[in-house]
């Protein structure tokens, strides 16, 4: 189920779970704070695992991602390749999706700001409405594609564009190819 971070959908799916008799549930983002107690109660009957940032208030099995570290690794790699004028494309950076912001933060603080290139990094995030709309199969791809087209018009000195995830990166690549950029090479 994709709740698209909609509280009503999340509640509906959580209420529906017991009747579906699942073998287990994998939550790929932290449950909304208003549903943590419900998730804990359900986890007594159904195996639950949460994949995302650690949440000390949630008492279920979890796989923690260090999104800040992921951002630092991305930045370090680009700096090692000699890139100093870069753009970072992300889905909406909302309170509900803190991991996105943590990755951006790691990208900036971990390397580019340390090297005094922080002012050479453009962060381009999609509008919050995208998280509220029903997701299309290509929503993240479209974010990468559309925001890359905008970036190329606004910033002519970029040497690299990074996407928060693979689907965004595919959109970035297609936009660059359409604009006749050689990747790797010119971007």
Cite the ranges covered by each PLM segment.
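Bacterial carbohydrate/catabolite-sensing allosteric modules
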Residues: 8-21, 36, 42-50, 54-187
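Structural motif
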Residues: 1, 28, 163-164
């Amino acid at each position: 189920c994709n709740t698209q971070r909609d509280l009503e959908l999340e509640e509906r799916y959580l209420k529906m779970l017991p009747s579906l008799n699942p073998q287990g549930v994998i939550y790929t983002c932290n449950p909304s704070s208003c549903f943590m107690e419900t998730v804990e109660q359900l986890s007594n009957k159904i195996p639950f695992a949460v994949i995302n940032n650690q949440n000390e208030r949630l008492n279920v099995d979890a796989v923690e991602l260090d999104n800040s570290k992921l951002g630092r690794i991305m930045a370090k790699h680009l700096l090692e390749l000699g890139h100093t004028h870069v753009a970072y494309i992300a889905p909406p950076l909302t309170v509900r999706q803190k991991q996105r912001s943590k990755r951006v933060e790691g990208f900036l603080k971990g390397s580019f700001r340390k090297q005094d290139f922080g002012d050479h990094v453009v962060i381009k995030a999609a509008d919050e409405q995208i998280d509220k709309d029903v997701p299309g199969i290509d929503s993240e791809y479209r974010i990468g594609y559309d925001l890359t087209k905008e970036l190329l018009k606004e910033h002519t000195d970029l040497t690299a564009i990074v996407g928060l995830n693979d689907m965004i990166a595919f959109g970035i690549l297609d936009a660059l190819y359409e604009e006749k950029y050689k990747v790797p090479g010119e971007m």
